[in-house]
Amino acid sequence: LLSRRQRQMCIRDRIGAVAIPATNLLLKSDFEYRFKAGNVDAILCTADGPVSREVDKACRSYKNLKVKIMVGASRKGWRSFNKEVKYFSSHFRRPHGENAIHGDDPSIMFFTSGTTSYPKITTHNFKYPLGHYVTAKYWHQVDPDGIHFAISDTGWGKALWGKIYGQWLCEACIFTYDFDNFDAKEILHMIEKYKITTFCAPPTVYRVMVHLKLDQYDLSSLQNVTTAGEALNPEIFEKFKAKTGLTLMEGFGQTETTLTIGNLVGTTPKPGSMGVPTPQYDVQIMLPDGTLAGPEEEGEIVICTEDGAPNGLFMEYYGDEEKTQNAWHDGYYHTGDTAYFDEDGYLWYVGRTDDVIKSSGYRIGPFEIENEIMKLPYVLECAVTSVPDPIRGQAIKASIVLANGEEGTDKLRSEIMKSLKKNIASYKWPKILDFTKELPKTISGKIRRKEIKENDWNENEDNE
């Protein structure tokens, strides 16, 4: 299922079909893998971009696609949604008997980025939308009389977090603005022009915004602003609040879940903290030996399911029982993310378990180092990763994107290192500072530390 805005999603929900949302940026090889892995037999897409052409190319090798439907245009070999829909009854007959829809039936499947293999297929059931009520009501705090604006490509789970299910359940008006290239100034203009009341975007968006003259825009309609997708640097939290008076409410979750941790209504955010567990999830921190951590002890974020899976938690990785068992066993779902509780019950993000750097016997999370670098006024964004080191095993590398046309010089390197040596322990000091024009990101805006690390480690192997 492909649609820039997913207006046909409500039809799909009513008839009980299983959907696989996808971005319109996919190419032939992407479709081939997704068709085969998901046993796809029908596709619905808009005329945006080269989607239909790439699908036709993929169908040269994949022969099980029975139905191809295009919305808003026509193409040889495709059925026209606009032409054919008028022939169907406007009265909906709910499926019954063996075709009846049950809450535990598969409903929607997401291809979620793989770190060591092809994307996994995260499968949710028809109770999944109910899990997003907390997301919209108590985190986004959507107003039934207001307008909610969330930035996310509709091919990703975050779009259902921020644009559809929870917001519908809360009777919110959803603002949709399609763009091919992100322009923070245009987003701010939209907020001002249409009097947006609640806004959600990845941290990358706010990192760009804080370097703009925000006082040139009337943002007085905004009642609540939220962010998720990756950890929010405290420096961005403080700068955004200083410039707008608005408090960024950070949240955490995965494609496999709904909002799991967040700064919810009634809580007082701590800059840099993800917030507290949401009521529907029993969140714990687990140590490598399988015991539960105490306050200030770093470990993996896990969700206890001994009393059953909460609404919003996925069913399985479709077609891969081994991956499902690896992630969900002994009464816990293992997120693969590391964090710790403080004494007040707030959670602080450390990194992905595979992002943690092991240097000279120390376990080092990248986020703390990134936060210190982000405090410098000339830094737009950064990523901390590991590189091979013959003595330490792994050394620390910081890849830095500079703001406002600043040039990366040896003098600037010295200035950054001087700041780091003043503010963080010596075992966390980067060995390498690399200035780069941009960082690799996923389509949804997350920094791909994994890609930076793999390139460096592969380069080291080639040089040996």
PLM region spans:
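Single conserved hydrophobic/aromatic residue that forms the stacking wall/gate
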Residues: 1-7, 11
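Structural core segment of the AMP-binding/adenylate-forming
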Residues: 14-84, 195, 404
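Conserved AMP-binding/adenylation subdomain of ANL enzymes
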Residues: 16, 130-150, 154-197, 212
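AMP-binding/adenylate-forming catalytic core of the ANL superfamily
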Residues: 26-36, 43-48, 199, 305, ...
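Conserved pre-ATP/AMP-binding loop-to-beta segment of ANL
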Residues: 70, 76, 86-111, 118, ...
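Conserved structural elements of the adenylate-forming
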Residues: 87-94, 103, 122-143, 157-158, ...
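Gly/Ser/Thr-rich phosphate-binding loop
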Residues: 169, 196-201, 210-270, 282, ...
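Conserved ATP/PPi-binding loop(s) of AMP-dependent carboxylate-activating enzymes
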Residues: 280, 291-326, 364
